[in-house]
């Protein structure tokens, strides 16, 4: 700790007793060499007197005569830090000044108490993608103040930057997964999706020394590797392994909790020490065309039939994405009153935005869903290549992705099929007086067959 850092130590309070800030004069009187300031981890509920036993083997000297103080306030060696006012839990890192000068009372003076990163908090709410919330995905290591108030600062700028990088990397790939329809759980990844993940992490962290052929495996094979096996395949894969662990912890948390809850993962995610380069000034967008092309083409579901269980019909990894839901509504002839295509270029309009939001809420079991939340979720897509807002047109959005490549049908084809389906339904109603069910398969087959005959 430098003199300046010592001058900036915050005020603390122990059992109601305040200790004023260290002044420059007091620091001069207690000058110590860097060798006399050591770091030591200790459990917050362990008697603080055990600090001597922990330090004696390291310092190779007896500390029996040393009192234990916290910024010059004497502590009871038989009581824990928690019992003496440090309101946190788990293991903390102490910065201890060892004072053994002749003519001075020997003591172990705790200068800082640092809470290490032990938990990963996940905000599970795909309808509210806020950077502020996602910044807490990886808990920042914090300097603890003993009055339990707001005085929380990061350990250092470097530590803060790296924590932020990991949080951004987790959220960044979550966006990539949703944008490309990649399952959240790595165990369900295909070989191409594993390679896409490797390339994304390499670009995100400016890595150049990873051999892609070593991870030309499926997601199930990837997740079956333990840490030792992984490093045998990827000798410099600390960052890859840490990122994979974060993704897997996120999946575990999302499986255990309902949406829109903050959950804490009990087991720590080990961020393996590695040199994480600082973020580059410009954001690199990773677009893997091969991963897109590998998507399975799906026939459109054009119907108006009742859904037996709207809450259980899902997309990748058991979760339907918002863009998939909107596309489903756009291929439902009975939903044209609330949402419909506009032209043939992928534009669509929410004719009844609150009704669309209500339907989305029913699908996701979120009764409080409204258009404000839905539009916030749609804005999440704007920085990708899936959906954008059409400027100057209220409630009008556009699929900017290549739907033909994605699902096998263009927006124009989907629009035409839906209109034909609606017209045939009306014709049947006029002939029979009631609406007869028209299946999507039959309609699509008839339409395509007619095209071939022409």
Curated annotation (Swiss-Prot):
SUPFAM superfamilies linked to this entry: SAM/Pointed domain (SSF47769), Ubiquitin-like (SSF54236), Winged helix' DNA-binding domain (SSF46785)
Ribonucleoprotein found in the keyword field: no
Domain PNT: residue ranges: 168-251
Location of the region described as Disordered in the Swiss-Prot/TrEMBL record: 295-316
Function field: Transcription factor capable of interacting with purine rich repeats (GA repeats). Positively regulates transcription of transcriptional repressor Rhit/Zpf13.
Protein name: GA-binding protein alpha chain
Presence of the UniProt keyword Nucleus in the record: yes
Entry keywords, A to Z: DNA-binding, Nucleus, Phosphoprotein, Transcription, Transcription regulation
InterPro entries in alphabetical order: Ets_dom, ETS_fam, GABP_asu_N, Pointed_dom, SAM/pointed_sf, TF_GA-bd_asu, Ubiquitin-like_domsf, WH-like_DNA-bd_sf
GO cellular component, as recorded: chromatin; nucleoplasm; nucleus
Pfam family, one: GABP-alpha
Family listed: Belongs to the ETS family.
Known tissue expression: Ubiquitous.
